[in-house]
Design a protein with these regions (language model features):
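A short beta-loop-alpha structural element at the N-terminal edge
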Residues: 5-17
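Conserved GNAT-fold acetyl-CoA-binding loop/helix
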Residues: 18-45
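Acetyl-CoA-dependent GNAT
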Residues: 36-93, 104-105, 110, 166-167
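Conserved beta-strand-loop-alpha-helix junction that forms the acyl-donor binding cleft
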Residues: 95, 121-133
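Conserved acetyl-CoA-binding loop-helix of GNAT-fold acetyltransferases
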Residues: 96-112, 134, 138
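C-terminal "cap" of GNAT-fold acetyltransferases
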Residues: 149-189
Length: 189
């Protein structure tokens, strides 16, 4: 039996990524979208993230994508350039196999390598027993806020939980002028 491997996502993965996300939108509360985006829309989102230098990973086993994770800009304002927001989605039949943990571990390492300083998790339906909250806690994220009743999906109000993981010294040291976020910022000026 082969093991689960991580690699950078490519456009060839977009059909499966779209399928996994459609299930999360339709059946879950991790995303506050109500209608699954098309393959074309998912491709545009993918292209934008990759062009921005953000990490986008897939986990696969025997050539089948089991899940994906990416980091994107937390907010568009330039002072936030060292902060990314993570997203991780696992196919329904791959849940409980450690796929989310493996993806997040890889994503954290990729965000560190790029020079980011904080990873923010914005978790829909952030109940304390939710798989996403438990996963982020296991990885060292701490709770940094809750927006009560901030989303309405599947006939109920949902809380949004914010969790945070400082990396590369967080806010305790000045940013590295050679980091990806700083180089992109200087190029835009």
């Amino acid at each position: 039996m082969s093991s689960i491997t991580l690699r950078a996502a490519t456009s060839a993965d977009l059909d499966r990524i779209t399928e996994i996300y459609a299930d999360a939108v339709t059946n879950g509360t991790a995303s506050y979208e109500l209608d699954p985006p098309s393959r074309i829309e998912m491709g545009a989102r993918f292209d934008s993230l990759v062009a921005g230098g953000f990490p986008y990973l897939v986990a696969e086993k025997d050539g089948i994508v089991l899940g994906y994770a990416y980091a994107g800009a937390f907010r568009p304002r330039p002072a936030y350039r060292f902060v990314v927001e993570d997203s991780v989605y696992v196919a329904p039949d791959a849940k409980g196999q450690g796929v989310g943990l493996l993806l997040m571990q890889g994503l954290i390492e990729a965000a560190k390598a790029a020079g980011f300083r904080q990873i923010i998790a914005v978790i829909g339906d952030g109940r304390p027993d939710s798989a996403s909250v438990r996963l982020h806690e296991k990885l060292g994220f701490h709770h940094s806020g809750r927006l009560e009743g901030s989303g309405y999906k599947h006939g109920r109000w949902l809380d949004t939980v914010f969790m945070q993981l400082p990396i590369n010294g967080g806010a305790s040291v000045p940013p590295d002028p050679q980091s990806l976020p700083e180089r992109k910022f200087r190029k835009q000026k």
